[in-house]
């Protein structure tokens, strides 16, 4: 059992290291936007990375890296040829926000002690005797439950309600 003593640093007791933050990187944020865009505009034909990048205001080079991760995860596929581009590998109703974020970010655990992997040694070794592990596991479960329940087709509908005509509102689109 791990016994914690009074500490001037409560973060240490909670298993939080300096720099730990519960927020998504630009990979997750931009990748989710790109997937919504791709789902919306590739219903009839493949979509180029350039057109997604222009509509979303994302660097084409950075978007290529994100699409490579999404392709590796089996969420998108490339179509070769003159009218090629990218399309979804599955129906939007079969792709969750959780699938997308995990493909881009890896684990969504708020802190490493939410899950200790005995095979790799990843996480907090003291987690078995740590009272706060329960808190982090509950938060982790809530995050995963939430992102797994939101499906890409719901976000497409939301996108259409915000911008019904589908016209690009980014000034870079007309360039």
Could you tell me what each predicted segment is?
Residues 3-19, 115-175:
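C-terminal regulatory/oligomerization modules of transcriptional regulators
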Residues 92-117, 132, 136-141:
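Conserved segment of winged-helix/HTH DNA-binding domains
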Residues 61:
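Key DNA-contact positions within bacterial/archaeal DNA-binding proteins
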Residues 75-83, 87-89:
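Beta-hairpin "wing" of winged helix-turn-helix
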Residues 50-56:
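A short alpha-helical element within helix-turn-helix/winged-helix DNA-binding domains
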């Amino acid at each position: 059992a791990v016994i914690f003593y009074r500490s001037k640093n409560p973060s240490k007791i909670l298993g939080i290291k300096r720099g730990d933050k519960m927020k998504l990187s630009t990979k997750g944020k931009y990748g989710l936007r790109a997937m919504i865009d791709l789902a919306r505009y590739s219903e009839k034909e493949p979509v180029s990375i350039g057109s997604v990048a222009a509509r979303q205001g994302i660097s084409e080079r950075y978007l290529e890296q994100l699409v490579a991760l999404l392709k590796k995860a089996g969420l998108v596929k490339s179509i070769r040829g003159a009218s090629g581009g990218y399309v979804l590998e599955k129906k939007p109703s079969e792709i969750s926000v959780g699938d997308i974020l995990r493909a881009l970010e890896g684990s969504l655990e708020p802190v490493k002690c939410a899950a200790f992997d005995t095979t790799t040694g990843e996480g907090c070794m003291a987690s078995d005797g740590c009272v706060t592990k329960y808190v982090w596991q509950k938060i982790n479960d809530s995050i995963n439950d939430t992102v797994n329940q939101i499906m890409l087709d719901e976000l497409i509908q939301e996108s259409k309600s915000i911008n019904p005509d589908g016209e690009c509102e980014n000034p870079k689109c007309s360039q």
